């Protein structure tokens, strides 16, 4: 009934946690015998003209590699799948009784980005926009340069950590561009951040230092 209501009321866009378009694998990953049925629901939404923001939480050895290629092939064929985001699974120490999961490393994260880039190029040629994006964390793990803000279009998957780095950098650059260079009494500022965001905060802190003589930013 809920599916019919969404279609009838044309609730759009909607967010869909896809993870994989392989029905058997989705049942295994979700530990739900009905989990494979969501794929036919996605097809119904697409046929009804409902825009889809799709998320793929990737687990190394499960739904990355060839399975990721399969999922992106299926999703990129849907005209109304307007954004597809791949994000890495978060692994904590509290996994007693659960499936053993590995975290992504430099090599496996880089492999995901390569696949994403290929399908993004395909989508850009077919639809005029990239549609397929990797979360910022993949670039950090792979030690690769983050794309520019222009790469992310309308930033449809910010809540999934896609393009947050590029957007923040652009917002700081735009704000500084509208600010006159100033000088004044020496001033020291301390900024605390996490390990993943450290390079970004250092880079924007340097931009601020260049704009304001006498400013010293220390990032921890």
Descriptions of predicted regions:
Residues 1-79, 90-119:
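Conserved Radical SAM active-site core
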Residues 76, 83-85, 90-220:
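Auxiliary Fe-S-binding modules of radical SAM enzymes
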